Amino acid sequence: MKKLTLLICFILISAIIDARQVEQYTIFELELKGPSAGNPFTDVQLSAEFRLMNRSIFCEGFYDGDGIYRIRFMPDQTGEWTYSTKSNIPQLDSKKGSIKCTNPSAGNHGPVKIRNTFDFGYADETPFYPVGTTCYAWVHQPEELVNQTLATIGNTAFNKIRMTVMPKNYDVYINNEPPFYPFEGSKEKGWDFFRPNPDFFRNFERRILELQKIGVEADVILFHPYDFGKWNLDKMNSEEASLYLSYLIARISSFRNVWWSMANEYDIMRKTDEEWEKYFRVIQTYDPYGHLCSIHNGMAWYNHSKPWITHLSIQTAYLQDIQDWRELYKKPVVIDECVYEGNIPNDWGNLTAEEMVNRFWISYCRGAYCTHGETYIHRENILWWSKGGKLYGKSPERIAFLHRIMTEAPAEGVYPLHNQWNKETQLIKDREWYLYYYGNSQQAMARIMLPKELKFRLEVIDAWNMTITPVAGEFSGRTEIPLPGRPYVAVRAKVINEN
């Protein structure tokens, strides 16, 4: 265990820059020595103000054990930043300095933000098309399995992963003990929720940084209802939960690839609307960077019009309502759970690969994004959805094919045609680009309407076989073309630029 702790520290030190020059959207870390007596997690207040010209960003510090305090800062603008600490402990107060923020290196696009109301983009305005996956408790597995998970996701197109902070207990599929526990104490003796365990959080943030290296966003689930009395880590009261949140946020809000998911199936948990609002306000107070933030539903719906909700994180199989949700909330829609590809007996875990791919295409062509999960029976109960490891399904490569289609679409001006009941879904950019998806129908012909005064080239796309076949000729106005008469086919039209 001691060797593992030292390894985690080494990796974090190499990833978090403790220097006076950092590139934009990376992490500057200030390390200070202070008191370890009493309860440093609650007795010591520590923060810093970072200034650049007329801008100020306030960052909370945190206790990292053994008398060490840290303040982490992600500069979002190049230039010479100055900082000054503030603390109720003289030893930590009024520490001043400066850092130079340089241009970001290749591949560093900054954190993901909302783009054009319904879409996502990095801070440098590079579009981000989320194709996510679900791997709830992968960080709480043995090192060998964690490394296998990272290798697997690194060889897919998945660029967002839904993951829980706390370990998970769910039936036979996942109930293992984590390598670290989040607080001092034990289930038998009771947890001291006012004393976080730095080793646990170092391990967690190490995994986020490893995801960052392979270009994957960490959709961090802060609360979940899947303890069922195994550890009683879900027994925090409101004050304890607020301290847990503020501590975690101080540690990882400076990581550019973090998203906040307040809870998974929030309505199953015994918390009031007032409590959820309090926790959202904790995020708003302690996250100076405004990371993306949402909440995931079971049966009941949260009020997504609240200002702290940046996008919808929805569990549903009723994809025909996507356009209504877009129009109602004026926010991006992410179908973060639409049932998983797999073969377990639970009704949420036995989609065919074909239907998983179909739901991704329907979501995209209705103006949303979708998230994958996989639950194939495994002799050692290593299911991707819960523990990670390897992927066995047939949908990931076809989701990668869809991601390619997304990146080839116009970056601006694309919207879904509101066509609620028909199987055909349409995503268009007026007079320039059209994508028609026919779902699980098997029609032998496509009938589409194009602007009469413009000429278009057409392609037939097979979403399952991952082929793109050009249609000979140029097309305008009312157009009919043959289709192969099987499901999961789309037609793409691109205007011919006469210039």
Protein language model features and the residues they cover:
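Aromatic- and carboxylate-lined catalytic core of secreted/periplasmic carbohydrate-active enzymes
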Residues: P40, G342-N343, M356-A472, E480-N499
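Positively charged n-region of N-terminal signal peptides that target proteins for export
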Residues: M1-L4, I252
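Non-catalytic, glycine-rich low-complexity segments
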Residues: A19-N54, C59-F62, S98-P104, N419-L427
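Extended acidic/polar, glycine-enriched regions
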Residues: E49, R55-T117
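Sec-dependent N-terminal signal peptides
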Residues: L4-I13
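Catalytic-core region of carbohydrate-active enzymes that cleave or remodel glycosidic bonds
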Residues: G290, K306-E380
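Solvent-exposed, conformationally flexible loop/turn segments
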Residues: V22-I27, S476-R478, R486
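Active-site mouth of glycoside hydrolases
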Residues: R51, P90, H109-D321
